[in-house]
Amino acid sequence: MEKIKLVVAGVEITFEPNQAAYNKLINEMSMDNKVAPANNYLNRIVAADSKEALAGIITRPGAALQLVGKINEIYAPELEIEVKN
């Protein structure tokens, strides 16, 4: 399992993203529902020893979406796709 360690506001938090959690995030998100799925995703993938640290950070406005963005930038980077005719 891939581990991603981030230092957020001076606090180290470890995440363990996986395909099932990532897919669930994508399926739960909608145009008017982004924050709750982001919070759920982070709580699904945070390492047990980082749960308390995440709880302290996630209450900040915008924190959940910023964390999800950074984690998924590493976990699921954009593919280079070229169209050939």
List each language-model region with its residue ranges.
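Short acidic, Pro/Gly- and aromatic-enriched capping/linker segments at domain boundaries
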Residues: M1-A9
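Short, surface-exposed, charged amphipathic helix/loop patches that serve as local interaction elements
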Residues: E2, E16-N85
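Short, solvent-exposed loop/turn motifs
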Residues: E12-T14
